[in-house]
Structures are given as C-alpha cells and as structure tokens.
C-alpha cells in the first residue's frame, strides 16, 4: 500500500542547515536525498498533480494508493461524515463512509458500506476485496 497526503499549504520535508536544504536554497531543482534505505525527491513546480498522475509513480511499488486531500477530484473515495451529514456528503464518487460513531450506526448507507474510523481491519479488507480482487481471496 502507498499513501499520498495533499496539502494546501507550503510543505517542506527538508531540514534547515542540512546539505540538501542548502542545495535547494541555492537554486538546485529538483533535489533528491537518499540514505538509510529511504529516498526523497523534491521539486519546485507550478504543476498541480492529479491523482492519476501521482498513482503512476507508485506503479509496480504498491497494489493500492491511499490519497488524502483530493475531495474535489473525480476519483473513488471513502467519505468521512457523521450520521446526520452522510446524505449531503454523498456523491457519485463516494464508495463508502467512515464515521466517528462507535455503536448503533448503520453498516450501510445508500447501498454503500459504513465503517467506524477505528476499524482499520474492516476498512482494509473491504478495500482489498473491492479494488484488488485477486488479493482479496482468502481474507
């Protein structure tokens, strides 16, 4: 599984005072940092990366990519919502709901599954079974 977090704020995974930060501050673009079994790649860009383009970077490295922060994109998504607001949060791209409710909530809303936010195992099994059927066998 891969993961992407989209932010509407300036982000920086580099540390001031480190060589890679100094390279970038001096105008190097892009800058990569590797070591200890990790690889980071940063690039200043005006490009707005959409989920399909980002997912290509994960090809061959992850069976599924979880992306947070792309709610205006036309991609399948699990929608966080309390019970009172599920109907207004539902649209053609919502494939299921996640709620903070801990007991007595419906397991389905509008034909879509509803999960408690702490049910990582249930959410994971549903994702695999729904989006990676070949891996879902035997779960």
Model feature map: region roles:
Residues 42-72:
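Phosphate-binding/switch loop-helix module in NTP-utilizing enzymes
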Residues 18-22, 49-50, 84-85:
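Short, hinge-like loop/turn segments at secondary-structure boundaries
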């Amino acid at each position: 599984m891969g993961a992407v977090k989209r932010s509407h704020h300036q982000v920086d995974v580099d540390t001031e005072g480190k060589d890679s930060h100094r390279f970038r501050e001096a105008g190097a673009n892009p800058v990569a940092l590797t070591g200890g079994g990790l690889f980071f790649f940063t690039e200043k860009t005006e490009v707005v990366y959409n989920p399909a383009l980002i997912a290509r970077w994960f090809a061959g490295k992850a069976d599924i990519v979880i992306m947070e922060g792309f709610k205006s994109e036309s991609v399948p998504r699990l929608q966080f919502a309390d019970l009172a607001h599920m109907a207004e949060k539902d649209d053609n791209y919502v494939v299921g709901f996640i709620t903070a409710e801990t007991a007595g909530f419906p397991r389905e809303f509008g034909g879509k599954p509803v999960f408690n936010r702490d049910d990582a195992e249930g959410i994971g099994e549903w994702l695999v079974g729904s989006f990676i059927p070949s891996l879902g066998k035997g779960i």
